[in-house]
Amino acid sequence: MKAMILAAGRGERMRPLTDTTPKPLLDVAGKPLIGWHLCRLKQAGFTEIVINHAWLGRQIEDALGDGSAYGVNIAYSPEPAGGLETAGGIAQALPLLGGQPFLVVNGDVLTDIDFTAAFQTASSLPEHISAHLWLVENPPHNPDGDFSLLPDSSVRPEVNGGNGLTFSGVGIYRPEMFDGIEAGSVAKLAPVLRGEMRQNRVSGQKHTGLWLDVGTVCRLKEAQALAGAWK
């Protein structure tokens, strides 16, 4: 089974750190941020990893190589300057991801989401489900949330009455979900997901453990403290 780590972002809110270093390679407790994902994916049984990149992508390839240092095999999906957004990046990488459900992880989060359980979920994804998402409590920078999670584990696009949760950036997808996106085109993920939700094709679960969106310098410092204690 394959997993994809999204690593094509410019990291504007991290400047000037990201002017010379791509965000996935920023140090978090002695290890590049993306390295935490690679280690945990390997432990969970994901050994075929696809990584997309745009900004300073050559540095990512030079640092991670073929993945052997982490015990995995890495294939890269380069994108043009500016990137293709999340859905566009996944669509471009489909030839590397194969025909089975795959896991996608945002490269700029620090989390202890159970990737072993994710492996099992991907292996047994019901035929009528095209995506399975991990949702978390809303952080201060996203107080209203993104989607709502119903008692039957279905995920809905409407957020009403304070029932919203935040998408963690970790999800399992069927490749067919991206068939309508032409390779090389720019496309956001949220509209694709909302379309699938309206057809009752998205399930999810709430994660209550460690999750941090490492999107600012302040949160990078928080990640360094968390990861230092975590390891």
UniProtKB/Swiss-Prot annotation:
Pathway: Cell wall biogenesis; peptidoglycan recycling. Gene3D superfamilies: Spore Coat Polysaccharide Biosynthesis Protein SpsA, Chain A (3.90.550.10). Its cofactor is Mg(2+). It is an enzyme of class 2 (transferase). Pfam families: NTP_transferase. GO terms for biological process: cell wall organization; peptidoglycan biosynthetic process; peptidoglycan turnover; regulation of cell shape. Catalyzes the formation of UDP-N-acetylmuramate (UDP-MurNAc), a crucial precursor of the bacterial peptidoglycan cell wall, from UTP and MurNAc-alpha-1P. Is likely involved in peptidoglycan recycling as part of a cell wall recycling pathway that bypasses de novo biosynthesis of the peptidoglycan precursor UDP-MurNAc. Is able to complement the fosfomycin sensitivity phenotype of a P.putida mutant lacking murU. This is N-acetylmuramate alpha-1-phosphate uridylyltransferase. It comes from Neisseria meningitidis serogroup B (strain ATCC BAA-335 / MC58).
